[in-house]
Amino acid sequence: MKQILFMDTTLRDGEQSPGVNLNEQEKLQIARQLERLGIHVMEAGFAAASEGDFQSVKRIANTIQNATVMSLARAKESDIRRAYEAVKGAVSPRLHVFLATSDIHMKYKLCMSKEDVLDSIYRSVTLGKSLFPTVQFSAEDATRTARDFLAEAVEVAIRAGANVINIPDTVGYTNPEEYYALFKYLQESVPSYEKAIFSCHCHDDLGMAVANSLAAVEGGALQVEGTINGIGERAGNAALEEVAVALHIRKDFYKAEPSMTLKEIKATSTLVSRLTGMVVSKNKAIVGANAFAHESGIHQDGVLKEVTTYEIIEPALVGESQNLFVLGKHSGRHAFTEKMKELGYEFTNDERDAVFEAFKKLADRKKEITEEDLRALMLGEAAFAAQQYNITQLQVHFVSNSTQCATVVLKDEEGNVFEDAATGSGSIEAIYNAIQRILGLECELADYRIQSITQGQDALAHVHVELKEGAHQVSGFGVAQDVLEASARAYVHAAGKLKSFIQLVK
């Protein structure tokens, strides 16, 4: 049975989702979790896009040990060399070079002839192969490219040294029958077909990204590209967790097994959702809150008698387990550290001390600490530690009518303390006005969302905010048992990003 490899582009294509703005530390958190998920290749970013992207790609490349780290590049020498500088320190570096092959792209975007495109493919892949052990070539907008020319372009790329050929459905235009037929056509029409691994990359504009990816596997694709939770620009990408579980459950049909640690799916989905601020729909397949819920009396009766009557996926398969008690206020530092290691977290002594202190504070207020609490705690403390400013004091009191007054004290990375107070129509507005006064910002609150991320009256709150000033928009999040504290943390997280970005642009 063939093994299907997965190329995750959450950190590149996924980050292009409107409103998503991950910092370097957040990208590294996701990369480490993708490594635990067993992702074969992770596209860490587009190194030539900016200095920030370059540094993020480089740090991920120098950190990840058990996956190939890849950078995107246009078919330009400067892009390719920049990508090499970013990922050369990786255990397994790869170049992903792309060039459009459809008539509409060649005419209106590239202003290049077919001959020019073929020449550019050959030169860019040849250069890439002289620097990288493996090169992936993507024929952008392949599904709207004339088949004979696509086959010619693919052959040129393979002869130039490409190890992986990606056939992307860039605008989500195709359907499963057409996509399957396209892979079969290339299998028959490309003389050097057997010398490369063929890959699929599907967008969800018509709601068929997962179905198209599975059709590509039927047609001979050995690598599937996509993102966690299906995030991405426009309608998003193929959700890798859905493709992987579909292959596993229906291996009788696809004759293929996913090369992925399925039990890490839920944890990965949750991390990506919270860091990006993109909430997973409750009825989403595999990872939605209702994915394993049964409300119908007939269904409940059937499941109680025999679970397979209405459940084709065991929740434990994807790491969806009961919210079991694991630690309490009497748990010591050693037990805490061992449990965090079991969950896949590693940190320095200073990081451990900070998270353990936060754990003890939570344990004093919450009788039972679950794995979900620990994951949320780690997520919140990691974001808190990476901020330019941290909240050291927060006070809110009633003034008159609906007016509230908030006093906020912040400390920066150098230990400088800043304090200010402001009023507002409610506690949240007062807190945010005070933070704006301290940081000297005049930004608009574009989005504010709050959700409970653990169960019970003593649940942890996760607050996501988006701030906008002019053309600049950033997001931030905060985790705490107290809603006001979580809200303040989220605002400081986003405001610090916004201030840094504005200073960088200036």
Swiss-Prot record:
Family statement drawn from the similarity comment of this UniProt entry: Belongs to the alpha-IPM synthase/homocitrate synthase family. LeuA type 1 subfamily.
InterPro entries named in the record: 2-IPM_HCS-like (IPR050073), 2-isopropylmalate_synth_dimer (IPR013709), AIPM/Hcit_synth_CS (IPR002034), Aldolase_TIM (IPR013785), LeuA/HCS_post-cat (IPR054691), LeuA_allosteric_dom_sf (IPR036230), LeuA_bact_synth (IPR005671), PYR_CT (IPR000891)
Keyword Cell inner membrane belongs to the record: no
Subcellular location: Cytoplasm
Gene behind this protein: leuA
Pyruvate carboxyltransferase domain residues: 4-266
Catalytic activity: 3-methyl-2-oxobutanoate + acetyl-CoA + H2O = (2S)-2-isopropylmalate + CoA + H(+)
Enzyme class: transferase
A Pfam match: LeuA_dimer
Name used for this protein in its record: 2-isopropylmalate synthase
Keywords: Amino-acid biosynthesis, Branched-chain amino acid biosynthesis, Cytoplasm, Leucine biosynthesis, Manganese, Metal-binding, Transferase
GO cellular component, one term: cytoplasm
Function: Catalyzes the condensation of the acetyl group of acetyl-CoA with 3-methyl-2-oxobutanoate (2-ketoisovalerate) to form 3-carboxy-3-hydroxy-4-methylpentanoate (2-isopropylmalate).
Subunit comment: Homodimer.
Residues reported to bind Mn(2+): D13, H201, H203, N237
